Design a protein with these regions (language model features):
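N-terminal beta-alpha lobe that positions the nucleotide/phosphoryl donor
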Residues: 1-149
Length: 149
């Protein structure tokens, strides 16, 4: 569950399981979980952006527009849209400053998408049930205004 609670870790795990993901700086990487169910540090680190120049290289590879995101961000903090290199270079220090110490990654912006959330409960026997979903697409500055269930 710890891996699924992290934006980079969950994307890396989904990609490893052949689940479709948006193009991102970690395309093509795989994760081999350790005996505790965690992604080894070196594999996680390979999926992170470590410099402004690395962010620009990744954006040029996947194509603009992109979202630069702090893995530990939330509530509109640590997320910036960049339509071109100049915006990305401006966004990089802002994202780092809003969520100090957080790993950072970059993902292709999906225009016109909906933000849907589903609550799932599972037990130790492999049983799981979806409790329902909600549309959280109405946002202001990347922060949910209301959730429609």
């Amino acid at each position: 569950m710890r891996v699924l609670g992290d934006k980079i870790g969950s994307t890396l795990l989904a990609q490893t399981a052949d689940v479709s993901t948006m193009p991102w700086n970690g395309d093509g990487l795989t994760a081999n979980l350790d005996e505790n169910g965690n992604i080894p540090e070196e594999q996680f680190d390979a999926a992170c952006i470590h410099s402004e120049d690395e962010a620009v290289e990744a954006a040029e590879r996947i194509g603009y527009p992109v979202m630069l995101k702090a893995s530990e961000g939330g509530g509109g903090k640590g997320i910036r849209k960049a339509l071109d290199e100049a915006e990305l270079r401006t966004a990089y220090p802002q994202v780092l400053g809003e969520v100090p110490g957080s790993p950072v990654f970059l993902v292709k912006l999906c225009v016109g998408a909906r933000h849907l959330e589903v609550q799932v409960v599972g037990d130790t026997h492999g049983n799981a049930i979806a409790l329902g979903g909600r549309d959280c697409s109405t946002q202001r500055r990347f922060q949910k205004i209301f959730e429609e269930g």
